[in-house]
Amino acid sequence: MRRRFKYPAVLAVLIIVLSISACGDKSEETGNDSDKAWADRYVALIQSGEARDYEDYDNMKKELDRVKEESGATYAYILSPMADGKPALDGDPSKDFAITVDAGAEPDDWGVTYEWEIQFKEAWDGDPATARSAWDDSEELQCWSAFAPVYDSEDNVVCILGIDYPCTDVIADYPEWNRDHPEWNGYETEITGEIPAAVQTQINEVKTLADKYAKELSAK
């Protein structure tokens, strides 16, 4: 009798083992997006076409919330170039960019366009870049903006991180570096004049922060 039931018993064991293996493979295949690099999850977000209804959006936003809090920025956000009127992975960086993931307390709508500025394209082309001047966030608060590229696991720039950083104390002494001030020097693309040391330090600081956190979001 033992010989009679030997092979069915072995077969049963094999079936159990194969079933467990199959379940394991399925788990690995489906995976959890939170285990992936933020940049690769961003690719999936854009490709989904679901905007902020995408199932992983809230988790992705939480990581930008962390960037905002840790850096001391007043605002942290993601911009993408546009194609066919919506944010894209391969849009034209010489035209307007659109906001996507937004860490603001009162976020802009998905896809709201930001009028093109040279620092957007510079960041998209792979170099951290800053605005050429500060601006008024409010009457009491001035900010300087910086942008840096975010790379996916295939080494593609898939978006740019933007941060707005408070600089009121510095700009109070150099109002000509505030584009919203009557004494603004007018620099929008190339800076041809001398940059005061304090202003240069501010520029370097915000650029370094944008680059640091963009690298944390990247898959590189």
Question: Where are the predicted features?
Answer:
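Bacterial signal peptide processing site
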Residues: 24-26
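Short N-terminal helix-loop-first-beta-strand/juxtamembrane motif that initiates sensory/input modules
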Residues: 65-86, 181-220
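Helix-start (N-cap) segments at beta->loop->alpha junctions
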Residues: 163-178
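Extracellular/periplasmic ligand-binding regions of membrane signal-transduction receptors
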Residues: 28-59, 191-200, 205-220
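C-terminal motif of bacterial Sec signal peptides marking the signal peptidase cleavage site
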Residues: 19-22
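Sensor-regulatory modules in signal-transduction proteins
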Residues: 136, 150-152
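A short beta-strand signature within small-molecule sensing/ligand-binding domains used
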Residues: 140-149
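Extracytoplasmic/periplasmic sensor domains and loops in membrane signaling proteins
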Residues: 94-136
